[in-house]
Amino acid sequence: IGWESTIAHELFHQWFGDLVTAESWSQITVNESFANYSETLWAEYKYGKDDGDDQNYTDMQGYLRGPGNSSKDLVRFHYADKEDVFDGVSYNKGGRILHMLRNYVGDDAFFKSLNKYLTNNKFKAGEAGNLRLAFEEVTGKDMNWYWNQWYYGSGHPIVKIDYNYNNGKA
């Protein structure tokens, strides 16, 4: 997909970064995670779900390969240099957190929540907490647990897969 993903990424900054900008450098992931996730959305839209999943997997691997990434919070209130927050956590992990969120709430609620966040915060500074409020308003669910675990915490999901083969079928 090459250059197309770069274009999708930069175009998404018209909304996440320009229409609503980060409240501070610690909140830059709100801009960059959406721009990163737009690459998956574009691949899925233009080439189909398999290509979107492939883009998502590639970005996940970029996060997992980064030394020390698992110990960094997505939203980092303390950093030595603002450039420190432009990394695989803010971009790649952030995009994967959005993908998990989309799967949790469903496409309809996910995209309505994004619209709500952008509408409520247009021409202002936003932060992860504003995004949570938009999701809560649309879904009617308390999303504090999700934000506390994924936006304000470090680490990544540990997945255990068990197979049971019966008659040659998994």
Segments and roles (model prediction):
Residues 1-170:
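Hydrophobic alpha-helical and helix-loop surface patches within well-folded domains
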